Amino acid sequence: MLRGRRVVTAVTGVGVANGAMVTALFIERFHPTEVLVSGTGSRFNPRIRTGDTVISTKTIHHAAGNLTNQGMVYRKVRGPLAGQMTSWYYRPDTRLLKLARAAVAGYEAEPVTVNGKAYRPRVLAGEVAASDMFGVSDAKIADLKAKLNPDIMEMESAAIAQVCTQLGVPHIVFRAGSNRTQSNPGNDYRKLGQTAAAAAARWTVYFTGCLTAVVKR
């Protein structure tokens, strides 16, 4: 039990294939009422600080489509069923998104200290992009900024959102910013990843309690 609700937690591992596989097995085995995705991501939006948690309003496969000399051209691809096409982006469940937006006002994040500066992280709505790329080049960053301009980049949520959507399970994605988006994030992620993961987890636990309160009304 967590905040009055029966929950099952699963660790996906890194990457879109792992995210999709674990989500499909999770749904098949446990038949969840909804799926909450909690984790970290690099800060594409410079206004997002380490520990700020983004409620995803749109979760994007940023490597789905054609890679041309002018950068990515995003497009649908064929799904597992005959005649089915899958999108390159997914929206969260409207009910969960409405509840998450409303829950922000009552949430007080734990203070963090990053690079000697103490502050209280925020929770805000934004867009999340995902692929199997851990680091991305300056050229890729420029292309992403011109075409998508996401707030957070990570490696699983688009695949998780796709599986949830195709299997008819409501979902919502929460990702806290860690390091800035860059070509070689390893050292920065090791320094900042735990702070971001803890921030996302605290918000997710709080939101779980909000879901419990709604059910009891």
Task: Go through the PLM ranges and name each one.
Residues 45-147:
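Mid-sequence, gly/pro-rich, charge-dense loop/helix-turn segments that line enzyme active sites
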Residues 1-30:
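N-terminal short beta-loop-beta anion/metal-coordinating cradle
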Residues 130-173, 182-183:
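A C-terminal functional module that forms or caps the active site or interfaces directly
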Residues 181-217:
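His/Asp/Glu-rich mid-to-C-terminal helical/loop segments that flank catalytic regions of hydrolases
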Residues 12, 16-19, 89-93, 153-154, ...:
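Solvent-exposed, acidic/flexible segments
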Residues 34-36:
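Structural motif
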Residues 20-24, 52, 97, 201:
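Extracytoplasmic/secreted envelope proteins and their assembly/folding machinery
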